[in-house]
């Protein structure tokens, strides 16, 4: 049975949060979910940062959509991140649409949905809000923090901003700043949304409608970038969609067309168009080096966190080189870092899929870090 957004777990963050744009928010909701139990020694907490279109429902069943959690392949009883053993925390980012403060919420100044009056947010703003959740849950230091894609960006920002908050960290398939190609793809998605007349300069929420066509196209753009060329060719090739020959029309003749349309229009039922604008903007603004006067090494100074950086060989959205650049900076800063490139043809989305080598690597690192963290806390 579906739950309503109003009924999900959330805290009200009362202390003011000064945003990078100069504005301040306070008394705002931050929605979250936890899995497993925090043990008596409080040495088993793992914070998961979600990606662009994710949410706090990491595993099990999402009570809003009735679909599987977005990382059910990796998180759950007996899985790589074992919820019988670890206490897993995940929050919906501010700017999102699954219960945390976002552009579809009511602006107290006029009792209308924020729309484009919502302040522009950054990855750093997201992370600072989530640190308040750890305070609420009584977690002073995490066993591990992890996340893929935008989740990995949040993780890097978290470690730079709060260098003593995590014993270990696993950034997955991410980058320390958005490339021109990343920005271009996000701009294409935003323009698709804004070109939909229903978008109406972000005011559609007050009319109880959604710019479905624009949002669906934005999602299609994303899905292309999440796959690899080889993986897409092997999965679809030029195969037709339930027909023997071309229709000589603009219907979905090819399986790949049908796939993109399905993914696009299924997405509009669970996500807010303005949230895509705000979150992709936060990703584009992310540049950890810029925050530290052009030096990524400076961002990671004074780190006691133990890092495992993971990339995927066929990921062209956040390439192996970009992930290796993070490793180089961590090494140069004196941080404890290891690196693993997973060989796969499944592209950027590999971290969400059942990739045995990836899951084995994830589990091995977390379990070994738990033993070290327990020993450290005994001293």
What are these regions (language model features)?
Residues 303, 309-311:
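Short beta-strand/loop motif that positions the catalytic acidic residue
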């Amino acid at each position: 049975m579906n739950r309503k957004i109003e009924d999900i777990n959330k805290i009200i963050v009362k202390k003011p949060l000064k945003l990078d744009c100069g504005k301040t928010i306070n008394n705002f909701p931050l929605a979250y979910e936890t899995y497993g139990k925090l043990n008596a020694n409080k040495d088993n907490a793992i914070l998961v940062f979600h990606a662009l279109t994710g949410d706090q429902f990491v595993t099990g069943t999402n009570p809003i959509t009735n679909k599987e959690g977005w990382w059910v392949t990796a998180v759950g009883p007996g899985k790589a991140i074992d919820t019988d053993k670890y206490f897993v925390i995940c929050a919906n980012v501010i700017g999102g649409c699954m219960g945390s403060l976002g552009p579809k919420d009511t602006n107290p100044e006029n009792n209308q949905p924020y729309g484009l009056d919502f302040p522009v947010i950054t990855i750093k703003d997201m992370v600072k809000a989530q640190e308040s959740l750890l305070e609420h849950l009584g977690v002073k230091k995490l066993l591990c923090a992890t996340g893929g894609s935008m989740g990995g960006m949040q993780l890097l920002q978290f470690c730079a901003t709060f260098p003593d908050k995590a014993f270990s960290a696993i950034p997955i398939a991410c980058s320390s700043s958005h490339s021109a190609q990343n920005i271009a793809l996000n701009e294409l998605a935003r323009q698709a949304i804004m070109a939909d007349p229903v978008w109406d300069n972000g005011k559609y929420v007050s009319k109880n409608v959604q710019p479905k066509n624009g949002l669906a196209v934005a999602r299609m753009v994303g899905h292309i970038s999440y796959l690899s060329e080889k993986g897409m060719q092997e999965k679809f090739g030029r195969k037709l969609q339930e027909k023997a020959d071309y229709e000589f029309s603009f219907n979905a003749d090819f399986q790949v067309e049908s796939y993109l349309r399905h993914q696009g229009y299924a997405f509009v039922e669970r996500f807010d168009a303005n949230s895509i604008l705000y979150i992709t903007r936060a990703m584009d603004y992310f540049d950890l080096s810029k925050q530290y006067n052009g030096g990524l090494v400076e961002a990671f100074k004074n780190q006691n966190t133990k890092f495992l950086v993971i990339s995927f060989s066929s990921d062209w959205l956040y390439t192996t080189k970009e992930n290796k650049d993070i490793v180089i900076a961590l090494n140069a800063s004196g941080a404890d870092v290891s690196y693993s490139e997973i060989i796969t043809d499944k592209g950027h989305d590999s971290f969400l899929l059942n990739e045995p080598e990836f899951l084995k690597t994830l589990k091995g690192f977390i379990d070994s870090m738990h033993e070290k963290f327990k020993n450290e806390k005994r001293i």
